[in-house]
């Protein structure tokens, strides 16, 4: 699905991502953990196209994507969410989700004049898809409400719905559990599992160790820009390098 080969990203003399190589298999939920400053978010930004790697290769389903713009990577089926979602606050939940699909005819001024029936038909299809995914994440009762009224956890669900409407095959989730109450976190986890069973692959940054250990197979561990190890929850929790670098012996 996704592979990195000797991926490096430098800012001045600092290597935020340092010679990282990995392969994500199809239909897996992979965790990415490490202490603050380990390079996890920079790695995400390289994969999603927000940062161009200084060196190395990224391939999505065999095709090079390193250096591509975020919209081109998104169009190839790779989407990401952010630790702090920022929906358009004065637009409704439905309108926020409707923004995501690419190549909407109604975005072209001339199309509204020359092919209004086609524009209207596509808009109806986009609305139906948006409502489907809003219902999937459990926000149908808020579909017509402005996004500004949503809680932090609800905003994460909105962001998930917004990427799902574009039908990605790989989703990068940046701390989906951060600042989320237990009830909404359970909903988020249930949706991730359901999507994975439908064939969606996930790479997840998360500091909630209980969540990572129970949900993710495998788990990758970064520290100081390097990938220390990849393995099962049991293997990672017993690896002395991981304990020294991040877990501090807290996991038995």
PLM features per residue range, with description:
Residues 109-142, 190-193:
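Conserved ABC ATPase "signature" region
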Residues 167:
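Conserved catalytic motifs of ABC-family nucleotide-binding domains
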Residues 33-35:
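The feature captures the beta-strand-to-loop junction immediately N-terminal to the Walker
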Residues 48:
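Helix-to-loop junction immediately C-terminal to a conserved catalytic motif
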Residues 171-175:
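Catalytic Walker B motif of ABC-type/P-loop ATPase nucleotide-binding domains
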Residues 146-150:
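Conserved ABC ATPase signature
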């Amino acid at each position: 699905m996704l592979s990195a080969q000797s991926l490096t990203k430098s800012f001045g003399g600092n290597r935020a991502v340092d010679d990282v190589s990995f392969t994500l298999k199809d239909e897996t939920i992979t965790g990415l953990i490490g202490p603050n400053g380990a390079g996890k978010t920079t790695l995400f930004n390289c994969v999603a196209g927000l940062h161009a790697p200084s060196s190395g290769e990224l391939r999505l389903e065999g095709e090079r994507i390193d250096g591509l713009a975020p919209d081109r990577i998104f169009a190839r089926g790779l989407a990401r969410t952010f630790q702090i979602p920022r929906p358009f606050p004065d637009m409704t939940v439905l309108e926020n989700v409707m923004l995501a699909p690419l190549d909407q005819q109604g975005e072209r001024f001339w199309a509204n004049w020359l092919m209004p029936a086609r524009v209207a038909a596509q808009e109806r299809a986009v609305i139906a898809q948006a409502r489907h995914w809003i219902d999937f994440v459990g926000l149908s009762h808020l579909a017509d409400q402005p996004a500004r009224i949503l809680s932090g956890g609800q905003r994460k669900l909105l962001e998930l719905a917004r990427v799902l409407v574009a039908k990605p095959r790989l989703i990068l989730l940046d701390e989906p559990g951060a600042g989320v109450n237990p009830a909404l976190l359970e909903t988020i986890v249930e949706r991730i599992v359901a999507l994975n069973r439908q064939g969606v692959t996930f790479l997840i940054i998360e500091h909630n160790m209980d969540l990572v250990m129970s949900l993710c197979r495998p788990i990758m561990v970064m520290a100081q820009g390097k990938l220390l190890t990849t393995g099962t929850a049991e293997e990672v929790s017993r690896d002395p390098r991981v304990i020294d670098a991040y877990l501090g012996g807290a996991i038995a």
